[in-house]
Swiss-Prot record:
Catalytic activity from the UniProt record: ATP + H2O = ADP + phosphate + H(+)
Motif interval(s): Q motif: 20-48
Residues binding ATP: A65, S66, T67, G68, S69, G70, K71, T72
GO cellular component: cytosol; nucleolus
Ranges of compositional bias, category Basic residues: 586-596
Predominant localisation class: nucleus
Protein's name according to its UniProt entry: ATP-dependent RNA helicase DBP9
E.C. numbers: 3.6.4.13
Gene: DBP9
Domain notes: The Q motif is unique to and characteristic of the DEAD box family of RNA helicases and controls ATP binding and hydrolysis.
Compositionally biased spans, kind Low complexity: 359-370
Keywords annotated in UniProt: ATP-binding, Helicase, Hydrolase, Nucleotide-binding, Nucleus, Ribosome biogenesis, RNA-binding, rRNA processing
Amino acid sequence: MSLKSTKTTAASETYLDDETTWDSLNLDPRLLQAIDKLGFENPTLIQSSAIPLALEEKRDIIAKASTGSGKTAAYAIPIIQNIMVQGSQLGTQSVVLVPTRELSNQVYQFMEQLIKFSNNKIGILNLSSNYSDQVLKSLLINKPEIIISTPSKLIQTLEAHEGKDIIDLSTVKNLTIDEVDLILSFGYKDDLQKLESYLPVKKNLQTFLMSATVNDDLNELKAKFCTKPAILKLDDDQSNNNKLVQFYAKTTEFDKFLLSYVIFKLNLIKGKTIVFVNNIDRGYRLKLFLEQFGIRCCILNSELPINSRLHIVEEFNKNVYHLLIATDDISVEKEEVDEVDEGEEEHEDAADADEKKQQNNNNNNNNHNNNNKEHKEVLKKNEKNKKHSSKKDKEYGVSRGVDFRNVACVLNFDLPTTSKSYVHRVGRTARAGKSGMALSFVIPEKEVGKHKTASLRSAKKDEKVLNRIVKQQQKNGFEIKPYQFDMKQVEGFRYRADDAFRAVTQTAIREARVKELKNELINSEKLKRFFQENPRDLASLRHDKELHPARVQAHLKRTPQYLLPESARLDVKNLGFIPFHKNKVGKYRKKSKGTKKRDPLKSFKK
């Protein structure tokens, strides 16, 4: 059996503008020095277009470009350049809004590198970090020039300190909203409306709206915050068509685990892989299952502390880990599924309008009442889900906006519930001109529920969601190909997978979650300051240690040769000479009598 894996190669210079140099942009020497330190030889197309418009013409910018095209530097460089030219004044001059805490930290680290040679004259505050109230007050009183935050955290801080001289946005000259489409899909529209009253919108406020897609919701923000913006669209879809290879494989509920075991144990995918699951328990079940075969992996979900999540992303980007199991269980997706289903029903109703007119009014009323009952049931389920997920971080988002570097493959172990979520998951690979592969497991409707322990509720709609994904990808010029595994060669691994899967009980999953949380809380809180002072010791902190299920089976870690496909077995002819009988030289050799130990005091002669 073989799986067509796409190896990541060096970045093709698709996005670079070779005709433009950094010196030609008339930037501050300190900023140029920082850019050179980062290793940026030439600006990208989006940067060479946006930076002159922002600095020379003072235009608002609306930029649409794919991930890895340099959108962050396109707004970060003009912000810092303006502050360096005008000098550090009293008051906050720039606000950067991002959808998730992980992305907030990445933007903060990037901007810190850009101000490396500014002699600490520019202050940057990452409001999404875990600060105590006293520490946060002291940082805000210093009036940092740049504030990076999620919309909800910024509004929460503004309302908590309203009427106090702690945080004041009346001096802001630049507003940046990064990943606009994600911010709107996360439900931050109300927060953006509240933010409008705190900002000097009617004055000279320069705005950057950065997004991978442009939709109708963007027009609302454009009307609120922009005046005669310059709209930049980097049409790079065609150049990326050959970079991303997409497959889907129809399989059973248990065979998902079996195929995952075979793929990772035989190293069929070369390079780093992100595996997406739809809930937290699912992630731990897969981790406990794989680690019985000696397959090391780490978990990323919304229950982990923010410091641990950020460290996992950083270590993954440094190639410390090669297999990451990420939970993508955002409640927005459930709402989108309901909206899509309702939209389809409305479309079907409109198509059959003529037939329905001939029916009795009583039937229409009954249908209306049934729809109301179904709607109430959906609301009840959503309320239960909200209560159940109260401990999760609402600003967690691993499939959206986070910069995972050099990801060779994205494996959708659980198919996402919407086509939009699929696009964001797949967007973690084939970034910045590099190649990548996406493989999605799909459960046919007739196979759902046959294996209760391995079953997942959202799998009922896998085929419907797949059809939407295929249609959307075809519109964008992409193709998702079916992939057929040679199950005859996989069957030999089934009995071992059965043993390992039975060992992963619900009790083992619960104990693993508690153990993981305890370890991560200790690493995140108590040792945070120690690791800051001793960065070398941070390397010893690993997140892919075995969690040890209740039943450890050491023999599963070794794969016998007879289970491997013929192409992967060792060549018997080249094993060398192996004697039939073991070498018996010395077997009958008499044991030499060792000299008795002598006591030097007793043997001492006068």
